[in-house]
């Protein structure tokens, strides 16, 4: 079972927007973040969720924990593609219907109850975003020194067998019901974590096109009204992150809706966590829709980095992934911009192919990115996936936010949620 937690809400902070970048300055002498280790989803059926990501997104099953490994109340499947690991965990017993003499530990009982409550409130959703760090104890201790309320699981060593070694973990609370596991693998060589066994995807006769992903690029959290700064304060105070990038409702708006966004980054810039909140508009924004159907703040989307977005999106479309639609007017305007603005790079992908695949382009003078977003992956209009390719450009698609918002607003209107 991947480390998880019973959450406590973070204390209320000021909702005043920071006025300068140095309000979240880079801090020296802090433990290093190595990157995203894995993302844990709590879902109703872990086996089906793993199969879904394997089939549509080209992941493969690499590890398992369940009844056969001695886990009597939870099942987890770990799927991977490149440096990306998703863990899908489900309860396999009803907490409300356990017999009085059920030999369940207090810890498992509390976790089983929490997991069912999480599923009822959020549906299938991201529960934990795990960071690999070089010193679990130092990161955890700083976090709880700043805010004792974020403590979920103190540092502990998960013992493996002699052949594979052990890992050190801790868990802290972030926005909503979301947690961060801090993990140091210390040379651990097992398939995922101690307690998991290696498992492969069942053989298939389908000839599906391969998908090669690289890593998690960023992970976006949506907040309710006036909660963005409080969430960013947590990352600055507890994890020594700094403000990497920000935009406000004057930049990210359409005729109907708007948002504010701040990207928080680890000191070494290997982990970036954009934080969004709604801003006033004529109608309901995508951020408001998310918060309503997620029943509170949570992870809105996970961006997956690829070296070849054309091949990746082509393969995903062939496998059945449903992406947002981008109107032809976007590409007409983009073609004019690319033809008239000065820049030090040339587009490495065929423009007509990008248009055919509805891939978005954002850039500055020194580089560019290509990106595309799936439609929500669940019946609730909550979590989705972004596919992104970068070329000397560390932005987050601000130039596409208006087009993206308009595309999502069309989907919202179809759902009756605009």
Segments the model singles out, each with a brief description of its role:
Residues 2, 31-86, 145-146, 155-163, ...:
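Core segments of cupin and vicinal oxygen chelate
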Residues 2-39, 43-45, 50-51, 55, ...:
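Hydrophobic, small-residue-rich alpha-helical packing segments that form membrane-like cores
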Residues 3-47, 126-131, 189-232, 295-305, ...:
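N-terminal beta-strand motif that seeds the catalytic metal site of vicinal oxygen chelate
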Residues 34-44, 77, 99-142, 171-172, ...:
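Vicinal oxygen chelate
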Residues 89-91, 106, 114, 121-255, ...:
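Extended catalytic-interface subdomain
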Residues 199, 268-287:
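Active-site-adjacent "gating/activation" loops or surface patches in catalytic cores
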């Amino acid at each position: 079972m991947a480390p998880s937690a019973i959450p406590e809400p973070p204390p209320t902070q000021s909702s005043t927007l920071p006025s300068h970048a140095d309000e979240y300055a880079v801090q020296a002498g802090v433990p290093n973040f190595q990157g995203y280790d894995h993302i844990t989803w709590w879902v109703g059926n872990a086996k089906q969720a793993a199969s879904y990501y394997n089939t549509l997104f080209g992941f493969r099953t690499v590890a398992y924990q369940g009844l056969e490994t001695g886990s009597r109340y939870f099942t987890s499947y770990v799927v991977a593609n490149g440096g990306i690991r998703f863990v899908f965990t489900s309860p396999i017993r009803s907490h409300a219907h356990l017999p009085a003499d059920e030999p369940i530990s207090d810890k498992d009982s509390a976790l089983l109850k929490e997991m069912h409550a999480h599923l009822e409130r959020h549906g299938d959703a991201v529960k934990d975003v795990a960071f690999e760090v070089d010193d679990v104890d130092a990161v955890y201790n700083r976090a709880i020194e700043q805010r004792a309320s974020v403590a979920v699981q103190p540092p502990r060593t998960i013992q493996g067998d002699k052949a594979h070694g052990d890992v050190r973990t801790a868990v802290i609370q972030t926005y909503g019901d979301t947690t961060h596991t801090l993990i140091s693998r210390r040379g651990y060589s097992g398939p995922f974590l101690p307690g998991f066994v290696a498992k492969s995807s069942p053989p298939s006769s389908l000839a599906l096109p391969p998908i090669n992903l690289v890593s998690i690029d960023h992970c976006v959290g949506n907040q309710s009204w006036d909660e963005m700064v409080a969430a960013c304060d947590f990352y600055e105070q507890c994890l020594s992150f700094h403000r990497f990038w920000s935009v406000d409702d004057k930049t990210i708006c359409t005729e109907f809706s708007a948002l504010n966004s701040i990207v928080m980054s680890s000191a070494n810039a290997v982990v970036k966590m954009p934080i969004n909140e709604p801003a006033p508009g004529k109608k309901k924004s995508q951020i408001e829709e998310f918060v309503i159907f997620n029943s509170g703040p949570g992870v809105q989307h996970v961006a997956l980095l690829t070296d070849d977005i054309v091949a990746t999106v082509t393969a995903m479309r062939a496998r059945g992934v449903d992406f947002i639609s981008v109107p032809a007017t976007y590409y007409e305007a983009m073609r004019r911009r690319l033809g008239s603005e000065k820049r030090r790079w040339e587009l490495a992908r065929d423009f007509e192919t990008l248009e055919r695949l509805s891939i978005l382009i954002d850039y500055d003078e020194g580089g560019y990115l290509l990106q595309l977003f799936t439609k929500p992956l669940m019946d609730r209009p909550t979590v989705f996936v972004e596919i992104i390719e970068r070329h000397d450009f560390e932005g987050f698609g601000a130039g596409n936010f208006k087009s993206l918002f308009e595309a999502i607003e069309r989907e919202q209107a179809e759902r009756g949620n605009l």
